[in-house]
Amino acid sequence: LKKILGITGVAIASVALLAACSSKSSKEASKSSGAKETINFATVGTTAPFSYEENGELTGYDVEVAKAVFKDSDKYEVKFQKTEWSSVFTGLDSAKYQMAGNNISYSEERDQKYLFSYPIGTTPAVLTVPKDSNIKKYDDIAGHSTQVVQGTSTATQLTEFNDKHSDKPVELNYTNENITQMLTSLNEGKYDFKIFDAPTVN
């Protein structure tokens, strides 16, 4: 596999640890008893270096930041919940989770429903293709196939690409596979390219 850096037209927003205490979030935890309120923190756990498992424990930048935030709190304790990406926002909406972090990018649509922390970084994207690919630059993806995860910035980006290239759209195959599985599929020639966050694929 090879990576094409600096993709033209990629608009990746600043990554933020999603302080998504959604408007539906329950705040009636037993404060009168003096017990700490549990903050359920959703993360996928397969997107190193942001969120991954090591020795059976969740870690990564987003996870460690959350641990540091709550370390000395006398009101809250954080409990990390591993889940699929497709369940992160539905879980926030239903108050199953009160926070989430998984290299989550900011968007105006998400800002209408969730509270974001200050940005904690920016994430460049890379276009990853097999070594013998004829895709040399971003515009070459027209008419080719890829995998995307619903609700990600990549899915939005490629949908917008197809709107502008309706005569030769990218074939979008939606999946819940993790990064390792998607790289394997790409290497086996099942798909033509994949856009990844650079730190994750590196």
What is the role of each PLM region?
Residues 1-8:
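Bacterial N-terminal signal peptides that target proteins for export
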Residues 17-20:
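C-terminal motif of bacterial Sec signal peptides marking the signal peptidase cleavage site
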Residues 22-24:
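Bacterial signal peptide processing site
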Residues 31-103, 175:
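Extracytoplasmic small-molecule ligand-binding "clamshell" domains
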Residues 41, 45-48, 58-72, 124-180, ...:
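Bilobed "Venus flytrap"/periplasmic-binding protein-like clamshell domains
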Residues 67, 79-140:
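Acidic, polar ligand-binding/catalytic clefts
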Residues 87, 102-112, 157-162, 184-202:
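A ligand-binding cleft/hinge motif common to bilobed small-molecule-binding domains
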